[in-house]
Amino acid sequence: MKKIYLTLVFVMAALAASAQGWPANYGGVMLQGFYCDSFRDTKWTTLESQAKEMGQYFDLVWIPQSGLCSGKSMGYNPKYYWNQNSSFGTEAELRALIKAFKDNGIGTIADVVVNHRDNMSNWVDFPAETYKGVTYQ
């Protein structure tokens, strides 16, 4: 039994080590498209207007969390994950930004911290959200 368990551990470790998801010899360059408390400056429309120039130098742009938060913030206290109208702009502006990046050869990476969440009244009182006809609480 011990040999079977040890074999299983080695197989799982090998699979985990090879499943990192990032190309082995990736030579691209990523730009962080925001800085601390930059929601006044880092509008989706501002980044979109810079997409052509960024495309000459960068392969990926890391953008902040885009869900709706309470008040103006950097996005790390989202109240709603499926509502993309945030301090950075509207969902339509976000989609236009991603398209502009794609058209200029830039990938987009969203910075999402899943366990950072704003509540309604206490630590576990989150608002209900509906996505594709299913309501989540």
Task: Place the predicted regions along the sequence by residue.
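Positively charged n-region of N-terminal signal peptides that target proteins for export
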Residues: M1-I4
